[in-house]
């Protein structure tokens, strides 16, 4: 191992004074030649955990990542720091790939990023056997989990690394894994001897908000108005909805782009490039598509449909606020989402074991959505973590929800489901309860039922909330044959007979005051007196990014520019003391940064 201590390298190359959280322990453990399994939330600084030991040890650090779209930016960010980094994946032409292979064999690389399918070829394994390797880093390690939402079969074969190079340390990293998945990762990757480093999964800078669907398009555009000119992601269930949402947002004056697997490759690539390199783009994407977005200044992630699981939700919302600045995770969901997801589970070709797992994951997520306690406490409990007190940064903490005794409305709703034959959807059931005289109610003879018009005391919106919460609590289930009808469950009987009382959450009516508060509370906080200098620095960064054809954040994060604007360094020595500026960036960009600070006074 090289004699350069980790701290010296951290300051000299990366420009940071100190490691964060468990980073130092992980770096020293791996640099000493030991295996590690690292669970750390997005934005926690996972990449430093393998980059620093790779630079401390002799040889090249081999980073295995499934996110091809990310590799180019990750490598460019390292080059900006003066690190000799390259990547090998299917996007490179033969000539470039051959050059990278020559540099690998000649010992001219510090870091090499490679896709798992490329790594596992006989040709590449042969190249590695002729190279000096510092370590193997297996990123996105949850991809090895068969039950996970990102399963990649090639990850199962990565045990070959330990079989062929037992003396080379391996570090596997993931930002999302509940305790069973953690055990599966260790087992499948042959990391029995690895030390586990498990950080808190909390992302304190993200505010969590859940709203009930009630004109979803208007709710989304109202939410986005509090994030004008900020970058964000809007997740939708289907490709069609992605495109419709992007079109709608454009008509509302937002700079929105679509992104899903059905778009032509060049359109996808161009939209992703624009999202990464331009400010204030809203990317509308499918939940199923892993975008591999490493943009640090994503200020919000909005879900217009319910994700399938807590892990999926955590991973998708985790793309917000990677720079540590305030960000928002906003979820808009209604009964229709629940009906659709439950039908998808029942109609799938999966085994009964798999279906049961999917059901419990969905029920867990519904519990989060309907909970009246701190969102953060519920979210983290799903990862086996206890959060000690209410967080003060979620909708339930900021505006505690009211509860109401819904026992009688619940009995009326369940009775109406039973008496109408357990095969009708919510819209029709509400019409019956509220005494509607429409054609369908009369045609079915439901105006003659004892439950007809017994629910006129509640409006349709409240009845939708009652039915939604009954389904979420498994007191009603969705007809899996595809018609979306509701029927009773075994648990319904206790409510109907009065043995079980029902308390429900009273849905909040969205108000603009809440949006204004939201606008004040999230986003990058720059003091008014620093704004002109901050914007001038962003202008220089945009110019440098265009010249080099790289995303702006690869050159400097917003938070670094804000620190410069606050501290106003007028010499290179003073600039060197601002966090996030390593030696290479200081010599490369320092004079121009200092010049702008002096000009702006």
Go through each PLM region and give its residues.
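Accessory DNA-binding and partner-docking regions appended to nucleic-acid-acting proteins
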Residues: 1-9, 357-359, 386-601
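Helicase motor core with emphasis on the C-terminal RecA-like subdomain
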Residues: 2-13, 17-21, 25-37, 41-47, ...
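Flexible coil/turn residues that form the inter-helical turn or adjacent wing/linker of helix-turn-helix
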Residues: 166, 228, 372, 422, ...
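Short, charged low-complexity linear segments at domain edges
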Residues: 353-385
């Amino acid at each position: 191992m090289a004699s350069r201590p980790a701290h010296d390298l951290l300051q000299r190359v990366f420009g940071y004074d100190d490691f964060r959280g468990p980073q130092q322990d992980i770096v020293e453990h791996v640099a000493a030649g030991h295996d590690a399994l690292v669970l750390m939330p997005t934005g926690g600084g996972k990449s430093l955990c393998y980059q620093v030991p790779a630079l401390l040890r002799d040889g090249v650090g081999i980073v295995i990542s499934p996110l091809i779209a990310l590799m180019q930016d990750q490598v460019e960010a390292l080059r900006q720091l003066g690190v000799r980094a390259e990547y090998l994946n299917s996007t490179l032409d033969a000539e470039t790939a051959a050059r990278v292979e020559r540099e690998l064999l000649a010992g001219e690389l510090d870091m090499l990023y490679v896709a798992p399918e490329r790594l596992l070829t006989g040709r590449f394994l042969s190249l590695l056997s002729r190279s000096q390797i510092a370590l193997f880093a297996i990123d996105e390690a949850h991809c090895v989990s068969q039950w996970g939402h990102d399963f990649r079969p090639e990850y199962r074969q990565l045990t070959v690394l330990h079989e062929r190079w037992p003396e080379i340390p391996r570090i596997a990293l993931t930002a999302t894994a509940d305790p069973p998945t953690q055990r599966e990762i260790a087992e499948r990757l042959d990391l029995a001897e690895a030390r586990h480093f498990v950080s808190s999964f909390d992302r304190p800078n993200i505010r969590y908000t859940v709203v009930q669907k009630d004109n979803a398009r208007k709710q989304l555009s109202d939410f986005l108005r509090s994030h004008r000119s900020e970058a964000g992601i809007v997740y939708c269930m289907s490709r069609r909805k992605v495109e419709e949402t992007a079109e709608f947002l454009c008509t509302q004056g937002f700079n929105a782009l679509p992104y899903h697997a059905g778009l032509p490759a060049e359109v996808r690539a161009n939209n992703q490039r624009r999202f990464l390199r331009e400010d204030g783009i809203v990317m509308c994407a499918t939940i199923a598509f892993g975008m591999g977005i490493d943009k640090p200044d994503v200020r919000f992630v909005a879900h217009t449909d319910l994700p399938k699981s807590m892990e999926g939700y955590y991973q998708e919302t985790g793309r917000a606020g990677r720079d540590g600045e305030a960000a928002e995770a906003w979820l808009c969901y209604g009964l229709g989402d629940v009906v659709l997801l439950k039908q998808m589970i029942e109609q799938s070709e999966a085994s009964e074991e798999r279906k049961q797992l999917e059901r419990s994951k969905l029920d867990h997520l519904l519990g989060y959505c309907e909970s009246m306690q701190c969102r953060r406490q519920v979210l983290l409990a799903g990862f086996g973590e206890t959060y000690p007190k209410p967080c003060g940064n979620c909708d339930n903490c900021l505006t505690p929800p009211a509860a109401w005794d819904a026992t009688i409305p619940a009995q009326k709703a369940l009775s109406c489901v039973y008496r109408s034959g357990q095969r009708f959807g919510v819209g029709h059931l509400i019409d019956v309860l509220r005494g509607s005289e429409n054609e369908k109610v009369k045609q079915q003879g439901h105006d003659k039922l004892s439950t007809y018009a017994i629910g006129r005391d509640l409006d349709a919106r409240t009845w939708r909330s009652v039915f939604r919460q009954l389904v979420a609590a498994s007191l009603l289930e969705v007809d899996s044959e595809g018609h979306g009808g509701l029927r009773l469950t075994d648990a319904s009987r206790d409510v109907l007979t009065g043995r079980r009382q029902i308390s429900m959450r009273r849905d909040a009516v969205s108000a603009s005051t809440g949006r204004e508060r939201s606008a004040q509370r999230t986003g990058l906080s720059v003091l008014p007196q620093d704004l002109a200098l901050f914007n001038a620095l962003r202008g220089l960064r945009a110019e440098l990014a265009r010249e080099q054809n790289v995303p702006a954040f690869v050159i400097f994060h917003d938070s670094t520019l804000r620190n410069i604007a606050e501290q106003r360094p007028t010499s290179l020595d003073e600039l060197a003391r601002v966090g996030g500026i390593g030696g290479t960036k200081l010599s490369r960009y320092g004079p121009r940064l200092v010049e702008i600070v002096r000009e702006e006074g």
